Amino acid sequence: MSTQTVDVVRSVYANFAKGEIEAVLAVLAPALEWVESPHDFLPHRGTHRTPAAVAGKVFGMVMATFDEFAVVPELFHDAGDTVVVEGRSVGTTKQGRRLDAAACWVWTVRDGLVVANHNYHDTDAWRTALLG
């Protein structure tokens, strides 16, 4: 079991929840693979390869789309350098539509830094929240 790896991932969720984005970015490797669903209706879709891209194209786009947004981790599965997190993405869009989507995040951590994050979402819930 890699407590340090799980702790790094837990810190991402804790700092995101507190709005401490710089602390989240501090544990991202300079070159990483952050993969979001490729669906056209998602403002943060695609693969992002730097902390700056994650900040702008993921966090920035989500915050521009939602009045309230949170990721809620429920279960952490430790697999050495990989941590699988089950949870939910929840929020209210600027149009007043609610999001409550099941999610699974697969993290890879090396030397205390996130080198990969692959996100799996209930895309129907996202589509409904974003498009009505």
Model-derived segments and spans:
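Hydrophobic pocket/interface hotspot
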Residues: 9-12, 24-25, 32, 54-55, ...
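Poly-acidic low-complexity segments
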Residues: 20, 33, 122-123
